[in-house]
């Protein structure tokens, strides 16, 4: 492997580790979509599109055929990416992180647009006309220069169309399409295709497969012989059986390896994912290179995640998504600070700011996904009349609600931070007021809450007139409750980043010192549940409320 490939693959491995919480077993889903395509797709039309993509010049008529076929594929597939504008604000990400993201997207925009100005990667076309590009190729050929990027004709392949924006998101391979074409057009069984691509995917866990690797594997798996030997080019449809398309499909056949190709993005987790990407970038010293050429792993991941915040950025159909990554991701760099809160009367619930109608609708939509008949854990940090953190967790589905609140009693908060939750006041000043109260008031009727110690939860429910909700107190000892503390923090610590302070162990006479680990309401719920069940479940929890909803509305938006 060349040294640059070694560095590139090291980045890929680092990103796989850093985003492992968002990778998924997708083999069965991809095969389901493949079978749907095999049953309903007209492969005569597929062959026509494959042929037109080999033409040196493509017209509006050719583009219409490609877009029509893409629409049909999109309608047949379950795995797709949908249009979703992403807004990242101070709170979910720090201002420095937002500025870093904005800068990287700007650099990526320049790189992508420069590369797409030519017919091939790394060949700059500027604003030359089709005729000028052809003349340039002829001059270079007559002067004895090597042919451009393996193009046998020496002519730059271009789209001669009226509206170039119609090209956006019409390309890129999809594993289901790749597998369907290999099966139908290659006359292979789907099982043989799955086996061959699985072998290619296993190789991809340790290196980037190349053409030499492909030839060796094809001896054992003949279906891989249909993969084209041509180098991938931009603006070439996903119906072509390129090596990169086959590798992507192979990654999906593993159900393991934390492959980036299996990432699914949801609006509720978008900010957390971007934060994780930036952390890996910093640790590995990754960067966006403005030099023309193929995207490096960081650039590729950043573009795909920011293109749409809802769906399968690597492997799903995205032909119905409009715009580019820098069009669909908006960064808000405004930090309004904390408004003054009125004092709280003794024994009364805090008077919290009103939520916007839009936020209330989002919260209600998330609460609808709670199963009122399922086991539901609840925990808070802070006091019932001044809570600073709330978590509600349903282990069967993995769904959870997790939010914070700025305290009114700062002195009490600092004492609790020192000996319990370890949260810092500065990290809560931008949290959305009124969120905890609205959630408690709108919990599903008939829901039964399970808690470790019910007194505080009962008081919290009474303050919000929810005496209709029953509570089960599991009454674990301190040792029992924290039996799986380290395992839970190791596995799920990424779900919460507010507990940064130093926690001191309380000393009780006749007892060993308590834990110095901070108490997180969400992770405590998972710990208590693990103690009752006897093990820590590997299921990845799913956030029901968008991360940005946890923070105050901001005003000034900067579009990238």
Curated annotation (Swiss-Prot):
<dbReference type="GO" id="GO:0019029">
    <property type="term" value="C:helical viral capsid"/>
</dbReference>
<dbReference type="InterPro" id="IPR038115">
    <property type="entry name" value="Nucleocapsid_C_sf"/>
</dbReference>
<keyword id="KW-0694">RNA-binding</keyword>
<keyword id="KW-0899">Viral immunoevasion</keyword>
<feature type="binding site">
    <location>
        <position position="389"/>
    </location>
    <ligand>
        <name>Zn(2+)</name>
    </ligand>
</feature>
<feature type="region of interest" description="Disordered">
    <location>
        <begin position="333"/>
        <end position="353"/>
    </location>
</feature>
<keyword id="KW-0543">Viral nucleoprotein</keyword>
<keyword id="KW-0945">Host-virus interaction</keyword>
<dbReference type="Pfam" id="PF17290">
    <property type="entry name" value="Arena_ncap_C"/>
</dbReference>
<keyword id="KW-0464">Manganese</keyword>
<dbReference type="GO" id="GO:0039724">
    <property type="term" value="P:symbiont-mediated suppression of host cytoplasmic pattern recognition receptor signaling pathway via inhibition of IKBKE activity"/>
</dbReference>
<keyword id="KW-1035">Host cytoplasm</keyword>
<dbReference type="InterPro" id="IPR035083">
    <property type="entry name" value="Nucleocapsid_N_arenaviridae"/>
</dbReference>
<keyword id="KW-0479">Metal-binding</keyword>
<keyword id="KW-1090">Inhibition of host innate immune response by virus</keyword>
<comment type="subunit">
    <text>Homomultimerizes to form the nucleocapsid. Binds to viral genomic RNA. Interacts with glycoprotein G2. Interacts with protein Z; this interaction probably directs the encapsidated genome to budding sites. Interacts with protein L; this interaction does not interfere with Z-L interaction. Interacts with host IKBKE (via Protein kinase domain); the interaction inhibits IKBKE kinase activity.</text>
</comment>
<dbReference type="GO" id="GO:0019013">
    <property type="term" value="C:viral nucleocapsid"/>
</dbReference>
<keyword id="KW-1139">Helical capsid protein</keyword>
<keyword id="KW-0922">Interferon antiviral system evasion</keyword>
<feature type="binding site">
    <location>
        <position position="524"/>
    </location>
    <ligand>
        <name>Mn(2+)</name>
    </ligand>
</feature>
<dbReference type="GO" id="GO:0046872">
    <property type="term" value="F:metal ion binding"/>
</dbReference>
<dbReference type="GO" id="GO:0003723">
    <property type="term" value="F:RNA binding"/>
</dbReference>
<keyword id="KW-0167">Capsid protein</keyword>
<feature type="region of interest" description="Binding site for the cap structure m7GTP">
    <location>
        <begin position="53"/>
        <end position="236"/>
    </location>
</feature>
<keyword id="KW-0946">Virion</keyword>
<feature type="binding site">
    <location>
        <position position="520"/>
    </location>
    <ligand>
        <name>Zn(2+)</name>
    </ligand>
</feature>
<dbReference type="GO" id="GO:0039689">
    <property type="term" value="P:negative stranded viral RNA replication"/>
</dbReference>
<dbReference type="GO" id="GO:1990904">
    <property type="term" value="C:ribonucleoprotein complex"/>
</dbReference>
<keyword id="KW-0378">Hydrolase</keyword>
<keyword id="KW-1113">Inhibition of host RLR pathway by virus</keyword>
<comment type="function">
    <text>Encapsidates the genome, protecting it from nucleases. The encapsidated genomic RNA is termed the nucleocapsid (NC). Serves as template for viral transcription and replication. The increased presence of protein N in host cell does not seem to trigger the switch from transcription to replication as observed in other negative strain RNA viruses.</text>
</comment>
<dbReference type="GO" id="GO:0016787">
    <property type="term" value="F:hydrolase activity"/>
</dbReference>
<comment type="similarity">
    <text>Belongs to the arenaviridae nucleocapsid protein family.</text>
</comment>
<keyword id="KW-1224">Inhibition of host IKBKE by virus</keyword>
<feature type="binding site">
    <location>
        <position position="381"/>
    </location>
    <ligand>
        <name>Mn(2+)</name>
    </ligand>
</feature>
<feature type="binding site">
    <location>
        <position position="499"/>
    </location>
    <ligand>
        <name>Zn(2+)</name>
    </ligand>
</feature>
<keyword id="KW-0687">Ribonucleoprotein</keyword>
<dbReference type="InterPro" id="IPR035084">
    <property type="entry name" value="Nucleocapsid_C_arenaviridae"/>
</dbReference>
<dbReference type="GO" id="GO:0030430">
    <property type="term" value="C:host cell cytoplasm"/>
</dbReference>
<protein>
    <recommendedName>
        <fullName>Nucleoprotein</fullName>
        <ecNumber>3.1.13.-</ecNumber>
    </recommendedName>
</protein>
<keyword id="KW-0862">Zinc</keyword>
<dbReference type="GO" id="GO:0039696">
    <property type="term" value="P:RNA-templated viral transcription"/>
</dbReference>
